Amino acid sequence: MTNRIRVAVVFGGRSNEHAVSCVSAGSVLRHLDPTRYEAVPIGITPQGGWVLANSDVAAIGLSHEALPSVDAGGTALTLTADPTRGGELVALDDAGAVLGTVDVVFPILHGPFGEDGTLQGMLELAGVPYVGPGVLASAAGMDKEFTKKLLAAEGLPVGTQVVLRPGTATLTEEQRERLGLPVFVKPARAGSSIGITKVDDWAALDTAIAAAREHDPKVIVEAGIVGREVECGVLEFPDGRISASVLAEIRMPEGDGPQFYDFDTKYLDDVCEFDVPAKLDDDIAEQVRELAVRAFQALDCQGLARVDFFVTADGPVINEINTMPGFTSISMYPRMWEATGIDYGTLVSTLIETALARGTGLR
């Protein structure tokens, strides 16, 4: 087993999706094939410190009572950015011992300082292959403003939005008329539906903007879209083929339950129902799958992405793209691929082998 590929599974991070990242990493570690891969779990603390984690991370779960976090008590380390040193992990103690090398990184990080191109840029400098899109696609996919601008430039269907930059307090009357009600107020660069508010009355707008700005100084206000919420997974294979999964539909509970698919609904509360595959007409489903691949290519993604849609009476509309979707046991991305015929373990192996085949640098 000495020829196994050493895979650094990097998780945690400085974003408000730290806990979800920890749980995703636990699922990935549980499904790594031990005959092919040697796992090197590396946690990033909420303060940004890198530590060598232990195998207990594979048992991490998520609940109202316990949101997991990376403990700073592990061996502090860094990944050298010198590409001539072959992915060396160096201890941050007085001795500066080399703790070994890694062949590839699986950066199962969600949100800023991990999914947004920052870590990807560091890995490019280090010359270490990594799972997922590169710097440009990661940065653009993290920022809802530029995601929609790039997709719209390629002629893909997107919803109406207004960007509130730092220093812009609220919407103008003209913008309110253009958007209509309801609107969704979101941090521009956050995921897992954190900081999102549905606004049905303009009197609540400023409070919603303030809530979003707790997570990001740049805020997006999106026009509400009436339609079915559908997701599609996109996967790149080592030979360069790009495929779309079967679709998943999220069905929100009727009555007094949550009004949209928020953080608690996604990860903590068992209140939504899911259809995998989604019960859509074949022609609509195929249209969504084709749009998902086009969105993947429009942002120059590699490896994987999850593309979220609203299927309206006038056709599908792209809501957003996730360049490192959740990998928890209940996450839609692995569930969609399992329904397509690729189980979790094979999915993880495919992503790693695609990263190794792609390498780093201009391509």
Curated annotation (Swiss-Prot):
Q: Where does ATP bind?
A: 176-231
Give GO cellular component annotations, separated by semicolons. Answer: cytosol
Swiss-Prot/TrEMBL GO biological process terms: cell wall organization; peptidoglycan biosynthetic process; regulation of cell shape
From the UniProt record, give the pathway where this protein acts.
Answer: Cell wall biogenesis; peptidoglycan biosynthesis
Chain residues that bind Mg(2+) 2: E320, N322
Q: What is its EC number?
A: 6.3.2.4
Q: Does the keyword Ligase apply?
A: yes
Q: What is its main location?
A: cytoplasm
What the entry lists under InterPro entries is as follows:
ATP-grasp (IPR011761), ATP_grasp_subdomain_1 (IPR013815), D-Ala_lig_Van_CS (IPR000291), D_ala_D_ala (IPR005905), Dala_Dala_lig_C (IPR011095), Dala_Dala_lig_N (IPR011127), PreATP-grasp_dom_sf (IPR016185)
Q: Which PROSITE patterns match?
A: ATP_GRASP, DALA_DALA_LIGASE_1, DALA_DALA_LIGASE_2
**For this UniProt entry, which segments traverse the membrane?**
none
Please list the cofactors this protein needs.
Mg(2+); Mn(2+)
Q: Which reaction does it catalyse?
A: 2 D-alanine + ATP = D-alanyl-D-alanine + ADP + phosphate + H(+)
Give the ATP-grasp domain ranges. 148-353
Pfam families hit by this protein: Dala_Dala_lig_C, Dala_Dala_lig_N
Q: Which keywords describe this protein according to UniProt?
A: ATP-binding, Cell shape, Cell wall biogenesis/degradation, Cytoplasm, Ligase, Magnesium, Manganese, Metal-binding, Nucleotide-binding, Peptidoglycan synthesis
Enumerate the SUPFAM superfamilies for this protein.
Answer: Glutathione synthetase ATP-binding domain-like, PreATP-grasp domain
Localisation: Cytoplasm
Domain of life where this protein originates: Bacteria
Q: What NCBIfam families does the entry give?
A: D_ala_D_alaTIGR, PRK01372.1, PRK01966.1-4
- What is its biological role? Cell wall formation.
What family is this? Belongs to the D-alanine--D-alanine ligase family.
Q: What is this protein called?
A: D-alanine--D-alanine ligase
Origin organism of this chain?
Nocardia farcinica (strain IFM 10152)
High-level lineage: Bacteria, Bacillati, Actinomycetota, Actinomycetes, Mycobacteriales
Provide the gene name from the record.
ddl
